[in-house]
Regions:
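Positively charged, amphipathic N-terminal segments that serve as targeting/anchoring signals
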Residues: 1-169
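A short acidic, often aromatic-flanked loop/helix-cap motif at beta-alpha or helix-coil junctions
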Residues: 69-76, 174-178, 193, 243, ...
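Alpha-helical structural motif
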Residues: 128, 214-217, 271
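Surface-exposed polar/charged interaction patches
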Residues: 138-139, 252, 256, 278-285
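Conserved RecA-like P-loop NTPase helicase motor core
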Residues: 163-245, 252
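BZIP DNA-binding basic region
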Residues: 265-291
């Protein structure tokens, strides 16, 4: 057989296609590719929140968390205990735009999500463009070559504007250092996990951490900017949901350490006390003003 369904046949033979709820065909990378190795090491951050953890849980793959110790490339090494990152060292480099006017568009839980843009892009495109321009021109006061912005790619043309049009980077960009000189960032997304994929995994008993997944995606994008080199950045993130996820991360309210056996979060001692101190130190309370 060599017809138009040939590719589907090939994937089915690899046991890589699933028919979900009589509505969708889902492709999952063949797990046998991982089983072919005696050991596989994955260097990543917030693994518990990522699709690949859901994938391994789905297939019943066994994994364990280990850490990395050392302070430079000459002495990095694996250690038995997971290394908990010190988010404070990054928090001190992030200034979040908390002005009421600029952030009003993102107050509702689903504002600036894909479904929200689908329904509202014609109504709000001019206002969003004005907000982004206002942020770069009047708040961060940065030249265009220091700006970085993102939105879901299908809406890029509708809201790109003067002074930042050429500074776009896809919100799911990975493995690029080309924007590590950017110090002003406009993040115009409110990210939610694909509902079909979420339902597929949950029906199979896989735990989905949607907020942590959204935070992981946000952090991946932010670390394309100058913060990856320890530079200060100014951030416009009008979605209240995404902004609060980031603020909680900044004060250590999320960590990546879980027990793979029962998948329960392992508490960190004194986390709340430390968080309160950092909230005061960095003025991270969500008391917005136009100042």
């Amino acid at each position: 057989y060599s017809g138009e369904l040939w590719n589907y046949r090939r994937l089915c033979e690899l046991n890589a296609v699933f028919y979900h709820n009589n509505t969708a065909l889902l492709y999952l990378f063949p797990v046998d590719c991982f089983k072919a190795f005696r050991q596989v090491y994955i260097l990543t951050y917030m693994f518990d929140a990522q699709v690949q953890r859901y994938y391994y849980n789905f297939y019943g793959a066994k994994f364990e968390y280990i850490g990395v110790a050392g302070d430079n490339v000459s002495n990095y090494h694996f250690v038995p205990e997971l290394t908990v990152s010190d988010n404070e060292q990054f928090a001190k480099h992030i200034t979040i735009e908390d002005g009421v006017t600029l952030n009003a568009i993102g107050e509702k839980p689903f504002s600036l999500s894909v479904s929200w843009y689908d329904k509202n892009i014609k109504t709000y495109s001019t206002g969003i463009k004005n907000n982004i321009y206002n942020f770069f021109h009047n708040k961060s006061k940065t030249p265009s070559n220091k700006n970085l912005w993102t939105v879901f790619k299908q809406y890029k043309s509708a809201i790109q504007g003067k002074g930042y049009a050429k500074s776009f980077l896809s919100c799911n960009a990975r493995a690029t250092n080309a924007y590590s000189d950017r110090t002003a960032v406009a993040y115009m997304c409110n990210i939610f996990f694909n509902p079909i994929l979420k339902n597929f995994f949950e029906q199979k008993g896989v735990r989905i951490e949607e907020d942590k997944w959204a935070l992981s995606e946000l952090l991946q994008f932010l670390f394309r900017s100058g913060i990856r080199k320890g530079e200060d950045i100014r951030l416009y993130i009008p979605s209240l949901r995404m902004r609060n996820l980031l603020k909680r991360w900044m004060v250590g309210m999320y960590d990546d350490k879980i027990d793979p056996e029962n998948q329960e979060q392992i508490p960190i001692e004194n986390k709340l006390e430390k968080a309160k101190a950092l909230i005061d130190k960095y003025n991270l309370n969500d008391t917005s003003s136009d100042a």
